Amino acid sequence: MKSIEELYKRALELKNKGMSDKEISTELHLSVNTVTWLLSKEFLKEGAVQDVKIGWRSLGVFGSRIISIAEVMSDIIREEMQRNSFEVDSILGIAINGIPYATMVSYLMDKELIVYRPHPARKEGFFSSNFAGVEGKRIVIIDDVASTGETLKRTITDVTKEGGKAVLCVILASKMGVDDLNGVPVRSLLRTRIIGGT
């Protein structure tokens, strides 16, 4: 998407299909606040945009590209394991966009795969019963884009409630500007931040 107007049209289209602001934010890789801002047509007024859209379609269209990114993520995980002397039992992918990367990392590292689906209304999410369980596992959490960190925080909380231990979060792109969440280290392949502006 090349313009704010196009983002607005896409957000409105998704809203008209019944998606919540949170679901739209996940689909468009924007914060919930930015989606609310777009849908309220605040962008028509003077003012600076307070978010960065991150699109990775060029990576996602081919499995070979996803596995290339997963190799980098696996290398980061091994680096953290060695640096901080911890072991990993399982790789957790946050639905939807964290799952392809987590699947490939799980394969490359020969670790169990856990799939987590966050609840769009910020309630407790759930772990898919078709994949590995959480209890007693040391877990690396993988997602594509972290805007505010709320989804990661909820995932860490839910992992803990289920008897697991989150030992690391690995993100394709982070807008957060933090090195840990709830005491769990966060590593990202890319970090974004807005500089300057009005």
Swiss-Prot record:
InterPro entries: GfcR-like, PRibTrfase_dom, PRTase-like
Keywords for this protein: DNA-binding, Transcription, Transcription regulation
One GO-annotated biological process of the protein: pyrimidine nucleobase biosynthetic process
Pfam families: Pribosyltran (PF00156)
GO molecular function, one term: DNA binding
Highest taxon in the source lineage: Archaea
Gene3D superfamilies per the UniProt record, alphabetical: 3.40.50.2020
Family the entry assigns: Belongs to the purine/pyrimidine phosphoribosyltransferase family. GfcR subfamily.
Cross-referenced HAMAP family: GfcR
Domains as described in the record: Contains an N-terminal DNA-binding winged helix-turn-helix domain and a C-terminal regulatory domain (or effector binding domain) resembling phosphoribosyltransferase (PRT) domain.
Protein name in the entry: Transcriptional regulator GfcR
Gene name of the encoded protein: gfcR
